[in-house]
């Protein structure tokens, strides 16, 4: 297999003719607090407080507290709802991968807790700074029949940038054509 920065050849396999992507929309998700399960994967429970959706293919808002991110330090595992500007409710099931690029930690240690109190932790990064990481989401959508049902028939891929203070993530999504 020969490879350069511009091309990758796979002997015996056909190239995917006409494969391209087109910007579809962006989503900002805002979070208030994170509950971290103290395990090797550092699984979190993080409900979205809300957010916005904008772009050429979809506009609206993230329904506050409509789901949660149950991700780990390396994976996305979130479900939440979007309310489109026409009032349609769209279910989002987001999976994907993320990797911290600077070797830093994701969370600061929470204060000591008493039995029955949930462990809460916050971002380890300074306020109002992008978190240096690579995020690759691949969401699935369940939308009602009508102007948004294209979401259920389209492969969507994206990238994201996490920010601290306020704690939020900005997702940018593309439809695979």
Question: For each predicted feature, which ranges?
Answer:
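Beta-strand-enriched cores of mature, soluble protein domains
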Residues: 2-177
């Amino acid at each position: 297999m020969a490879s350069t920065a511009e091309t990758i050849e796979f002997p015996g396999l056909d190239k995917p003719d006409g494969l391209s992507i087109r910007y579809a929309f962006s989503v900002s998700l805002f979070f208030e607090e994170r509950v971290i399960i103290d395990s090797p994967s550092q699984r979190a429970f993080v409900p979205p407080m809300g957010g916005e959706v904008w772009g050429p293919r979809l506009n609206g808002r993230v329904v506050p507290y409509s789901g949660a991110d149950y991700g780990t330090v390396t994976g996305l595992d979130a479900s939440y709802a979007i309310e489109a500007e026409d009032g349609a409710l769209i279910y989002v099931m987001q999976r994907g991968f993320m990797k911290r690029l600077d070797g830093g930690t994701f969370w600061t240690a929470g204060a000591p807790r008493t039995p029955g109190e949930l462990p809460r932790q916050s971002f380890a990064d300074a306020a109002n700074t992008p978190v240096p990481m690579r995020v690759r989401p691949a969401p699935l959508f369940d939308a009602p029949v009508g102007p948004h049902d294209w979401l259920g028939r389209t492969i969507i891929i994206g990238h994201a940038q996490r920010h601290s203070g306020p704690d939020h993530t900005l997702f940018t999504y593309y439809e695979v054509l």
